[in-house]
Design a protein with these regions (language model features):
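A short beta-loop-alpha structural element at the N-terminal edge
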Residues: 2-16
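Conserved GNAT-fold acetyl-CoA-binding loop/helix
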Residues: 22-44
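Conserved beta-hairpin
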Residues: 52-67
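Conserved acyl-donor/pantetheine-binding loop and adjacent beta-alpha core of acyl/acetyltransferases
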Residues: 68-96, 104, 157-160
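Conserved acetyl-CoA pyrophosphate-binding loop and the N-cap/start of the following alpha-helix
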Residues: 103, 107-115
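Conserved active-site alpha-helix within GNAT-family acetyltransferase domains
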Residues: 110, 122, 134-152, 161
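Conserved GNAT acetyl-CoA-binding A-motif
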Residues: 113, 120-131
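C-terminal "cap" of GNAT-fold acetyltransferases
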Residues: 133, 144-146, 156-181
Length: 181
């Protein structure tokens, strides 16, 4: 598996991976609380790509997952009692981590998180923060396995969606956790 910054040629495949996941969730159990045609969208991936914040995972040239890594913290983050007290410029935010359903459970999500942690450490960040719908139990389980700790829960409004109750999580990159994953 190769993880790298996204190229413009990846954008269609990223959008298709969002559709694949949402179609799968419509047919099976849905955990993301995302909505088909509303969130996430091609526009979100374009914006992230233009800001150089979109990363993709691929196997043999086929996109199997993606994530957004940004320094911009959503306004709701101000209401959370985070475990680390680092200044904002030392925080990286992980958003819209998506793994194609046929690759779920095969380590792609963990590899993306591992990459985010390694990259953040190299760039001098002290923590990675994220949030997800409280009902996304599979993702919560994986994030906890990968050094993220719960920081609290509260309302969050994803772009274009109604407000939901989210779990806010944080990975303290200065902690002695490198052997956990």
């Amino acid at each position: 598996m190769r993880i790298r910054p996204a190229d413009a040629k990846d954008l269609d495949a990223v959008a298709q991976s969002y559709r694949d996941l949402l179609m799968h969730e419509m047919e099976q159990t849905g955990y993301s609380n995302w909505k088909f045609g509303v969130f996430p969208t091609m526009e979100i991936s374009h914006r992230a790509h233009n800001r150089q914040e979109l990363y993709v995972a691929e196997v043999k040239g086929r996109l199997i997952g993606s994530m957004i890594l940004t320094e911009r913290q959503p306004k709701e983050y101000k209401n959370i009692s985070w475990n680390t007290t680092s200044p904002d410029e030392k925080i990286l935010v992980l958003q819209v981590l998506c793994v194609r359903p046929q690759f779920s459970g095969k380590g792609c999500g963990k590899s993306l998180l591992r990459y985010a942690g390694e990259m953040a450490r190299e760039m001098g960040y002290s923590a990675i923060r994220c949030n997800m719908w409280e009902g996304n139990e599979p993702a919560i389980h994986v994030f906890r396995q990968m050094n993220f700790t719960d920081a609290g829960s509260g309302p969050f409004r994803p772009e274009g969606l109604p407000e939901e109750q989210d779990l806010f999580m944080e990975w303290d990159l200065n902690g002695d956790d490198r052997n956990r994953y």
